[in-house]
Swiss-Prot record:
CDD domains: PTH2 (cd02430). This is Peptidyl-tRNA hydrolase. It comes from Methanothermobacter thermautotrophicus (strain ATCC 29096 / DSM 1053 / JCM 10044 / NBRC 100330 / Delta H). GO terms for biological process: translation. It is an enzyme of class 3 (hydrolase).
């Protein structure tokens, strides 16, 4: 079991901004995950992996694949208070779910 957070590298966000957006993605997706998966994930150490994509199009392609696979997810849209315009999609939280299920979609992405 793991959770994957995907960050858009094309936005050139600062480290603090990336951390905040990744946290929003993690919590948002966690809240949409079934209880039995959450318990299993917690028992296995709550593994999280943060990766990046180069564009909004790439992120949305993964988002569609995750939805089609029935994996819990959360698309983060920034509030626009600091570095980027309001409504900008910054991150995607995926899972927690089975490693193999998530890896079929995100396994080729680069670690952040």
């Amino acid at each position: 079991m793991k959770q994957v957070i995907i960050v858009r590298s094309d936005l050139k966000m600062g480290k603090g901004k990336i951390a905040a957006q990744a946290c929003h993605a993690s919590i948002g997706s966690f809240k949409r995950t079934e209880e039995d998966k959450i318990r299993k994930w917690e028992l296995e150490g709550s593994k999280k992996v943060i990766v990046s994509v180069n564009s909004l199009d790439e992120l949305l392609e993964i988002y569609r694949a995750v939805k089609e696979a029935g994996i819990s997810n959360y698309l983060v849209r920034d509030a626009g208070h600091t570095q980027i315009p309001a409504g900008t999609i910054t991150c995607l939280g995926i899972g927690p779910d089975d490693d193999e299920k998530i890896d079929k979609i995100t396994g080729d992405l680069k670690l952040l």
